Amino acid sequence: MYDNEAKFSLWCDFIERNFLQSEFNSLLENNIINGATSNPAIFKTAFASPAYKKIIETSNKRHPKDLYEILATQDIKITACKMLRNYANGDDGFVSIEVDPNLSDDTAATIEEGIRLYNLISMPNVMIKIPATKDEAMSTLMARGISVNATLIFSPDQVKNCLEAFKEGSKAYASRFIDTTMPKGVISVFVSRFDRKLDEVMAAKSLPTGQVGIMNAANIYHLIEDFGLENVRTLFASTGVKGGSLRGDYYVRELMYKNSINTAPLETIKEFIKEKAEAKNVPSKENISSFFQIIKNNEIDINVVYKDLLSDGLKQFVSAFDDIMKSL
């Protein structure tokens, strides 16, 4: 764990075969990271590297999705094995794999694929990653003892639905298995996309830039902590900086909250570890409320922003997944 006192974890939002055999080991051994996440966009980039060329060329014309799952689950299993000691010691050690984003509107298919991927990898420290559009899928997987990463979280309403789903799934699991380790849940709050979308508008209205994502994340953090599920934590995602005047590790340093996780791109992690960082105080609920009232007063409809970002995020994941299918 990066900061034991604050119970702040840093996870790596990148997986690639050669990286797993080299730099990943160093980050893990030096207690810089203690978890990892993946998504279709990450695998799209990874599979274009030379590490996979021979495997793809000798795949005997497998169906693209079958080949994708072979490559992805191999990488996830390698990652899970490397972090098994962390997991056994209660120091996170989780790695996430996402279900096919094309299934986001099909609860039954999402559940089926989540169970299948979990069984295929067959490691206790794997989290099944599900876009937060299907609450029943989250609760069903957790009830079966499968840890879940609820992703593409933008709005407080999404968070409330996720928390209820995790509560239901946890209760169902606990009723069947007494005195066993509870499956874990993380709620992946996307951060930087708010500012990439709104900074220009904010600047034009003489409002502070680089703040909407932070304040929204802080608001959601309060919701999760107040709900009080011991097996569920806040995970801050989309924390890389693309252009602009912000330093590369801005969204990691600003969101070092107690009992939280930040999953960051490799370049962001490299920037972050150059200088010592300390845990941050979370903005008060009153300050958060005042901030969003100012936004509302300036005719920025945050609810429309929530919907747009979720829609865009789903489209991006589907596009990346479909691009992988074409390339394989």
Predicted feature locations:
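Active-site beta->alpha loop and helix N-cap motifs at the rims of alpha/beta catalytic domains
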Residues: I42-K44, P50-A137
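Flexible, acidic glycine-rich loops studded with aromatic residues
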Residues: E230-S327
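Structural preference for beta-strand elements that scaffold enzyme active sites
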Residues: K7-W11, N34-T37, D92-S96, N125-K129, ...
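Catalytic alpha/beta core domains of metabolic enzymes, predominantly
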Residues: D135, S147-E267
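Catalytic beta/alpha-barrel core
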Residues: D13, A72, P124-T133, I146-Q158
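Active-site-adjacent beta->alpha loops and helix N-cap segments on the catalytic face
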Residues: Q21, D106-I111, I130-G145, S155-F166
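N- or domain-start disorder-to-order transition segments that initiate the globular core
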Residues: M1-E23
